[in-house]
């Protein structure tokens, strides 16, 4: 998504259309949440709390890819969207890319590692066949 159509996407995701997937551009998973808010506001004037509620109920998982110094793209983080806390969208980092010591400027070597954070919405994701 790139603009005001973001609200249409979120509303479709929130009306029982399981299995939705989209791409967006952000510097991190939390930055992507802010970008989604901004893109909704590009199309309609709406209270930020309502936008955040739409995002938090529509999106289950955020997969963040990044370009590495060797020009490859790697999955850097996998986050679960937990809900709203203190007025902000709360993310739970599940996996993070760990670079290996043998990496150099020409080849980045590493792997995703599971964090110690438990999956919070496990039952919801199991119902959808994702956990």
Where are the regions that the model predicts?
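NTP-binding/hydrolysis catalytic cores, primarily Walker-type P-loop NTPases
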Residues: 71-131
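Conserved P-loop NTPase nucleotide-binding/switch module
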Residues: 1-86
């Amino acid at each position: 998504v790139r603009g005001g159509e973001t609200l249409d996407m979120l509303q479709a995701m929130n009306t029982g259309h399981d299995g939705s997937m989209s791409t967006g551009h952000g510097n991190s998973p939390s930055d992507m949440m802010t970008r989604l808010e901004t893109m909704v506001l590009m199309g309609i004037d709406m209270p930020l709390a309502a936008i955040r509620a739409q995002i938090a109920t529509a999106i289950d998982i955020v997969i963040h890819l990044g370009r590495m110094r060797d020009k490859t793209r790697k999955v850097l983080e996998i986050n679960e969207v937990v809900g709203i806390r203190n007025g902000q969208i709360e993310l739970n980092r599940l996996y993070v890319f760990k670079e290996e010591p043998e990496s150099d400027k020409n080849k980045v070597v590493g792997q995703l590692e599971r964090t110690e954070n438990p999956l919070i919405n496990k039952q919801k994701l199991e119902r959808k066949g994702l956990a």
